[in-house]
């Protein structure tokens, strides 16, 4: 199987691996975020937002956004970028 740079594998709540396509990374208020969509999903509306936290130059973690205001700001920035592309 060909490995693609825009596909990453994450573990779900049950410890099962799931592949995600990196739709976009964006910066909002000095923080970096990733918009991911499940590779095996047929629905266009399934997307997840994660905050990118760098451990060092080569390592990072994707963490869920707990703060509603932060999440809303990232979604608004993403939607604005998508509207501009259309």
UniProtKB/Swiss-Prot annotation:
Domain of life: Bacteria
Family matches, as Pfam families: DUF1292
Disulfide bond positions: none
Family recorded in the similarity comment: Belongs to the UPF0473 family.
HAMAP family found in the cross-reference section: UPF0473
Name of protein: UPF0473 protein Clos_1662
Organism: Alkaliphilus oremlandii (strain OhILAs) (Clostridium oremlandii (strain OhILAs))
Biological classification of the source: Bacteria, Bacillati, Bacillota, Clostridia, Peptostreptococcales
């Amino acid at each position: 199987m060909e490995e693609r740079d825009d596909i990453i594998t994450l573990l779900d709540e049950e410890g099962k691996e799931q592949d995600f396509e990196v739709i976009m990374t964006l910066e909002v208020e000095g923080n970096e975020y990733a918009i991911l969509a499940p590779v095996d999903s047929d629905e266009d509306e399934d997307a997840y937002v994660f905050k990118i936290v760098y451990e060092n130059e080569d390592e990072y973690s994707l963490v869920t956004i707990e703060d509603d205001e932060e999440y809303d700001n990232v979604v608004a920035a993403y939607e604005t970028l998508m509207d501009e592309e259309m």
